[in-house]
Amino acid sequence: MKKLLLLASVLAWVSGVFAEEKPKLIVGVVISHFYPEWMDMYANELSDNGLKRIMKQGARVNMNYNYFYTQTGVDHASIYTGMLPTEHGIVSRAWYDRLRRKRQYSTQSDRYTEIGDQQADSIKSLSPDYLQTMSLGSAMKWNNPMSRVFSIAMNGDEAVLSGGSSADMAIWFSEKTGKWVSSSYYRSELPEWLRMYNTWVESDHFVNKGWMMLSDEDKSAARIRLTNHFY
C-alpha cells in the first residue's frame, strides 16, 4: 500500500506514549502514492519545521497491512481503524448488494443529503454507515467525549472513512461546484467559517495559477530513482 501516514504529534504520541502530559492535538496526514524513501531522497529540499522535523524527531514503524486489493477509502479505513478490510467492512470502493440487488458504494447513503453551496434534498450524500469498527477518532471520543474530530480531504470517501463514525464533521471538495461540502450525517448546515471560506475561494482561484516547482526540472528529475521500485 503506497500510502504514508504522518502524525504531526508523533513526538508526544509515539515517542512519549506514557508521558504525563497528553497531546492536545493529533494530526493525521495520508499522502496517496507516496513512497517512504522519497523523504530521504528529497530531505535536502524539505523545510526544517515540516516533514524533515518528523524525519529527525519522529518514529518510523512498519505499517504494512496484509491485504492485496488497495483502493481509495479501503486504505483510509484500514489506516484509521488499524484493521483489515474483512474486519472494518470496507472491502472495496463499491460492491454488489444481493439483498437490494444493486451496486452499493462504500460511503453512499440515501438517508443523508449534501450540505454546501448546492444544498438540496435531491442531492444524496455520504456517511460512514458501512464502517463496522472503531476508528482513531471514535476511540478519542470514547476516551474523552469533549474531543473534537474533523476530517478533510479532496475525495468524499477519504474524508468520511478517515473521520470514522463519531467525527464531528467530514469535509471534502466538490468537483461540481469547486467548493467544500459535507453531509447532513454530521450537521444540518456548514459552519460559518467554512461558508465564508467558500465565498472567498472560487473554483478558478487556483486553476488560473501555474504549477511552480521549487527546483528546476532537471534537478528534480535527477533525484528520482526508479531502480529500486517494482515498475
PLM features per residue range, with description:
Residues 4-13:
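Sec-dependent N-terminal signal peptides
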Residues 17-21:
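Boundary at the C-terminal end of the N-terminal hydrophobic targeting segment
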Residues 23-35, 54, 79, 140:
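Beta-strand elements within well-structured catalytic alpha/beta cores of enzymes
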Residues 24-25, 49, 74, 131-138:
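A structural signal for well-ordered alpha-helical segments within the folded catalytic domains
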Residues 32-36, 60-61, 67-72, 85-86, ...:
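Solvent-exposed loop/turn segments at secondary-structure junctions
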Residues 35-41, 64-66, 121-127:
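Second-shell loop/turn segments in exported
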Residues 40-88, 148-150:
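Short, structured active-site-proximal loop/turn typified by the sulfatase FGly-forming signature C/S-X-P-X-R
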Residues 84, 92-231:
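His/Asp/Glu-rich, glycine-adjacent segments
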